[in-house]
C-alpha cells in the first residue's frame, strides 16, 4: 500500500492539532539523605517556608508528605509527616505549592483525628466541606474585643477565685499527677448546652490515657460538641509539633463565624520537647536547655490565636452572613513542671504569654484537696471583668479567708494558746478549704455554686463539723432543688441576686440547717 506524501502530511497535521499537552511545571529535587524522619533535599530552589513537599508513596499507595523547615543555600531540610522508612537517597521530591491544611467544620465534632485531621476512631471517613491552613496570623488589636463574658468551668475554686472569660488564655500548670487534665476535662464537660464547641489536643500522651479521656467525654455526653486531636507518644516528633496548630485551626473555624470555642492543649511541654527534637535533627543551634532560639515564638504564635473578636471582624469574615455576633476561642494550655520549678525555660515563657495561671500543687493533691489549686499564686489577669455578677458578689471573701488561713495556720503550729478571733479564722479557713474540694466529672451549676458560697459567707457552716461540710453542701443542693426550684431557676437565669432572692435564699438555707442538725 502506497501513501501519498500529501496524505501523510495531512495525517500528521491532524494528529498534531488533536494533541493536548498539559504542561505541569513543578519544582523538583532529589533526596540526599534520610535520618530520623529528617530528609535533606538538593534542588527545590523555589520552595516556601512551611510548604508541603510530596515524597514517593508507600508500598500500599498512601501519599507521603513533608514540611520544608530549613531553607539553605544549596539544600532544603524537611521533616516527614508519617512513615519515612520507604524513602531512599536519590528519590524525587516535588513542591506542591501549598501550605499544610487540615479539614475544619462541624463535621469533625464527636470525632478523634490525628494531627493531619485524618480520622483514627474507626467511625469511617469525615466528609468535611472545608480545609484551612494550620499556620495563621492571629487577629490584630483592632479586630479584638475585650473579654467580658464568663466561661464557667463548673469548679468552685476556679469560678470563684480565678475566673476564666471567653477569649482568655488561662494556663494550667503543675507537676505530673496533680490533676491538670482533670481540671481541663471538667471545663469541657461543663460546656454542655452552653453553645461552646470544644477541641482537646493530646500531645505526646500514652494512647491509653487518650482513650480514657475520650471514654470520660463520651460518658458525660460531651463528645457531641468536642473534637479530639491526638498525637500520641508513639507518633513522630513532627506530628506532635504540628498537632497543636491543627487543633487551633479547627477551633478558629467556630471563632471566625461568631461562635464560641474552647481549646485545651495537653500539654505544651511535650510539644516544646518535640520541636526541640526536630530542631536539633535539622542542626539548628541549641540555646537554653537545648531548646532552639524560637521556642518562645513557637508558643506565642499559637496562643495569640485564642482571642475574642468583634462584630465587624465576624461580619467581614463571613461576608455579611453573620451580623452582630462576636466570636471567641478560649485556650487552656497545660504545662508540666519538674519538682514545682516554674522558673524553668518553657514554664516562664508560657506564663508570660498567657492571661493568668492556675497552679496545682502536689502537696495539696496528696493532702486530699482536689482540685489541688494553690489560691495564693493562681491568678486570672482578665477574668475578673468576665466573672458572673452573682458569683463575683459572693466570692469576694473566699480568697481573703484562705489567704489569712494559710498565714495563721503556719503561725498556729508554734503557738499553744490562740485568742478567740484567731481560732474563728482558722475554723472558717478549714471549712472553706474543705468546701472547695470537688469530685471529678461533677461540675456545678451557677445557682448551686451561689448557694454554697452564700451559705459559707453568711456563717451557716461555722458550727458544722469540717468532715461534714461536703455532706452539708450536697444536702443543701438537694433541698433547694426539691423545695425552692423556682428560686434556683431564677438565680440560674438572671445570674444576679436581688434583695428578695437573697431573703428567700437565707430563709431556705436556715430551714435546711435546722433539718440537717
Curated annotation (Swiss-Prot):
Keyword tags: ATP synthesis, ATP-binding, Cell inner membrane, Cell membrane, CF(1), Hydrogen ion transport, Ion transport, Membrane, Nucleotide-binding, Translocase, Transport
Membrane topology: Peripheral membrane protein
SUPFAM superfamilies: C-terminal domain of alpha and beta subunits of F1 ATP synthase, N-terminal domain of alpha and beta subunits of F1 ATP synthase, P-loop containing nucleoside triphosphate hydrolases
Record site feature (Required for activity), residues: 378
rRNA-binding keyword on record: no
Binding site for ATP: 174-181
Reactions that this protein is recorded to catalyse: ATP + H2O + 4 H(+)(in) = ADP + phosphate + 5 H(+)(out)
Predominant place of localization: membrane
CDD domains: ATP-synt_F1_alpha_C (cd18113), ATP-synt_F1_alpha_N (cd18116), F1-ATPase_alpha_CD (cd01132)
Cross-referenced InterPro entries: ATP_synth_asu-like_sf, ATP_synth_asu_C, ATP_synth_asu_C_sf, ATP_synth_F1_a_nt-bd_dom, ATP_synth_F1_asu, ATPase_a/bsu_AS, ATPase_F1/V1/A1_a/bsu_N, ATPase_F1/V1/A1_a/bsu_N_sf
GO CC annotations on file: plasma membrane; proton-transporting ATP synthase complex
Domain of life assignment: Bacteria
Translocase among keywords: yes
GO molecular function: ADP binding; ATP binding; proton-transporting ATP synthase activity, rotational mechanism
Assembly with partners or alone: F-type ATPases have 2 components, CF(1) - the catalytic core - and CF(0) - the membrane proton channel. CF(1) has five subunits: alpha(3), beta(3), gamma(1), delta(1), epsilon(1). CF(0) has three main subunits: a(1), b(2) and c(9-12). The alpha and beta chains form an alternating ring which encloses part of the gamma chain. CF(1) is attached to CF(0) by a central stalk formed by the gamma and epsilon chains, while a peripheral stalk is formed by the delta and b chains.
NCBIfam families xrefs: atpA, PRK13343.1
Function: Produces ATP from ADP in the presence of a proton gradient across the membrane. The alpha chain is a regulatory subunit.
UniProt name for this protein: ATP synthase subunit alpha
Organism: Polaromonas sp. (strain JS666 / ATCC BAA-500)
Gene: atpA
Amino acid at each position: 500500500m502506497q501513501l501519498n506524501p500529501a496524505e501523510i502530511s495531512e495525517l500528521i497535521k491532524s494528529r498534531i492539532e488533536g494533541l493536548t499537552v498539559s504542561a505541569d511545571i513543578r519544582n523538583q529535587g532529589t533526596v540526599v539523605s534520610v535520618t530520623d524522619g529528617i530528609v535533606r533535599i538538593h534542588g527545590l530552589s523555589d520552595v516556601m517556608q512551611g510548604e508541603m513537599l510530596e515524597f514517593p508513596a508507600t508500598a500500599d499507595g498512601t501519599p507521603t508528605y513533608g514540611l520544608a523547615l530549613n531553607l539553605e543555600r544549596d539544600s532544603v531540610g524537611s521533616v516527614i509527616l508519617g512513615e519515612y522508612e520507604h524513602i531512599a537517597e536519590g528519590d524525587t521530591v516535588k513542591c506542591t505549592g501549598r501550605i499544610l491544611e487540615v479539614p475544619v467544620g462541624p463535621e469533625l465534632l464527636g470525632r478523634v483525628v490525628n494531627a493531619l485531621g485524618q480520622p483514627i476512631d474507626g467511625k469511617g471517613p469525615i466528609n468535611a466541606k472545608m480545609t484551612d491552613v494550620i499556620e495563621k496570623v492571629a487577629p490584630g488589636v483592632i479586630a479584638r474585643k475585650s473579654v467580658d463574658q464568663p466561661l464557667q468551668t463548673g469548679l468552685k475554686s476556679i469560678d470563684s477565685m480565678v475566673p476564666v472569660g471567653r477569649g482568655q488564655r488561662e494556663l494550667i500548670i503543675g507537676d505530673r499527677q496533680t490533676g491538670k487534665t482533670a481540671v481541663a476535662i471538667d471545663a469541657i464537660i461543663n460546656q454542655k448546652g452552653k453553645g461552646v464547641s470544644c477541641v482537646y489536643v493530646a500531645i505526646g500522651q500514652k494512647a491509653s490515657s487518650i482513650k480514657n479521656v475520650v471514654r470520660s467525654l463520651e460518658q458525660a455526653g460531651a463528645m457531641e460538641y468536642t473534637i479530639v486531636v491526638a498525637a500520641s507518644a508513639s507518633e513522630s516528633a513532627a506530628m506532635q509539633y504540628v498537632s497543636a496548630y491543627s487543633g487551633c485551626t479547627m477551633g478558629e473555624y467556630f471563632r471566625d463565624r461568631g461562635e464560641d470555642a474552647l481549646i485545651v492543649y495537653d500539654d505544651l511541654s511535650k510539644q516544646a520537647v518535640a520541636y526541640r527534637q526536630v530542631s536539633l535533627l535539622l542542626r539548628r543551634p541549641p540555646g537554653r536547655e537545648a531548646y532552639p532560639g524560637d521556642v518562645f515564638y513557637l508558643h506565642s504564635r499559637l496562643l495569640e490565636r485564642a482571642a475574642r473578636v468583634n462584630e465587624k471582624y465576624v461580619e467581614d469574615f463571613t461576608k455579611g452572613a453573620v451580623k452582630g455576633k462576636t466570636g471567641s476561642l478560649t485556650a487552656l494550655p497545660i504545662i508540666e513542671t519538674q519538682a514545682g520549678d516554674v522558673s524553668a525555660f518553657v514554664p516562664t515563657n508560657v506564663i508570660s504569654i498567657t492571661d493568668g495561671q492556675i497552679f496545682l500543687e502536689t502537696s495539696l493533691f496528696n493532702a486530699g484537696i482536689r482540685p489541688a489549686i494553690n489560691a495564693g499564686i493562681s491568678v486570672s489577669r482578665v477574668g475578673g471583668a468576665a466573672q458572673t455578677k452573682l458569683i463575683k458578689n459572693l466570692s469576694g471573701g473566699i480568697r481573703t479567708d484562705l489567704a489569712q488561713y494559710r498565714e495563721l495556720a503556719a503561725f498556729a503550729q508554734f503557738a499553744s494558746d490562740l485568742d478567740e478571733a484567731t481560732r474563728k479564722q482558722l475554723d472558717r479557713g478549714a471549712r472553706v478549704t474543705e468546701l472547695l474540694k470537688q469530685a471529678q466529672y461533677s461540675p456545678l451549676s451557677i445557682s448551686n455554686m451561689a448557694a454554697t458560697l452564700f451559705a459559707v459567707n453568711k456563717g451557716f457552716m461555722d458550727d458544722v463539723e469540717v468532715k461534714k461540710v461536703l455532706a452539708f453542701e450536697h444536702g443543701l443542693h438537694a433541698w433547694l432543688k426539691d423545695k425552692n426550684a423556682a428560686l434556683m431557676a431564677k438565680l440560674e437565669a438572671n445570674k444576679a441576686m436581688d434583695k428578695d432572692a437573697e431573703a428567700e435564699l437565707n430563709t431556705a438555707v436556715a430551714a435546711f440547717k435546722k433539718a440537717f442538725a
